[in-house]
Amino acid sequence: MKLLNSISSLGFGVVASMMLTSCASVEAPSPVGPLPSEHQVEWHKMEKYAFVHFGLNTFADKEWGYGDTPASELNPTNLDCEQWVRVAKEAGMQGFIITAKHHDGFCLWPTELTEYCIRNSPYKDGKGDIVGELQAACKKHGLKFGVYLSPWDRNAANYGTPEYLEYYHKQ
């Protein structure tokens, strides 16, 4: 019986030692490869964004634009960019991205770099700026704002040339 008690005490001591040493803190391993920047980590925390595609195809009833729809077809009535942003915020979105220029080449802001833009549409008598209106609404309602600008431009005759790259960067 005395031997059994000694073995039990020894077993308890071994188990207790193992438990205590397994609770010791260990340093994390060094990272391997590139680490995300603080800005990139913050971007990943933004889980929900509205991505809105609105442009000439909305009014031409087309799924795919070729850059040949006249700017005069963009004529939204009662467009309320603040309403879009409010709905996005109510839906839990943290930001709003507008397709400012899709592959058809039409620009939703009054750029001087191309005639194929909102200033040549009847919207607000050519003085409209949907990109600017959305940006202001996002700022007012506390949403982040972004634009999608397609690198492909079916309306630009110089697409695919070094001159086009310069034009694209100026946009």
Q: What residues fall within each predicted segment?
A:
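Bacterial N-terminal signal peptides that target proteins for export
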Residues: 1-11
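C-terminal motif of bacterial Sec signal peptides marking the signal peptidase cleavage site
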Residues: 21-22
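Mature catalytic domains of secreted/periplasmic carbohydrate-active enzymes
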Residues: 25-171
